[in-house]
């Protein structure tokens, strides 16, 4: 997928891509063309992973507030019945191949109308894309 393929669509960021771009680390430059001037969407699972990582790393109040501020700039897809149904379908297919939170992230993207493209640094989303028509 190229940035032009996205048109003006919002994009769902997985945890790694959000972290790369927000904190300007790792391969952030690789993802910037896909995310600049676009509405960012996060899965509730991504929000949980981000907060867990910050707590585990011992972030202080200032960094935690900054993380919360960055998350509030995004639309967060909650864990709805539609998301749970998509997760069940994905888990039935990929249980031993894809991590649980990646399945939740994909389920959030697939449960939207239209389906949201996903920016991910994880090869697992390629497997999901091939089976479930998920743009990555």
Predicted features and spans:
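Short, well-structured N-terminal submotif of metal-dependent ribonuclease cores
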Residues: 1-42, 53-68
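Active-site neighborhoods of divalent-metal-dependent phosphate/nucleic-acid chemistry enzymes
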Residues: 2-6, 74-119, 127
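Histidine- and aromatic-rich ligand-binding microenvironments
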Residues: 13-14, 43, 98-99, 122
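Nucleotide phosphate-binding site architecture
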Residues: 18-19, 48-51, 126
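Short, polar loop motifs at secondary-structure junctions
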Residues: 24-26, 121-124
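A general structural signal for well-ordered alpha-helical segments in protein cores
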Residues: 27, 47, 64-67, 84, ...
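Short loop/helix-cap segments at secondary-structure boundaries that form the rim of catalytic
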Residues: 31-33, 125-131
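Active-site-proximal, substrate-binding regions of enzyme catalytic domains
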Residues: 49, 58-75, 82-83
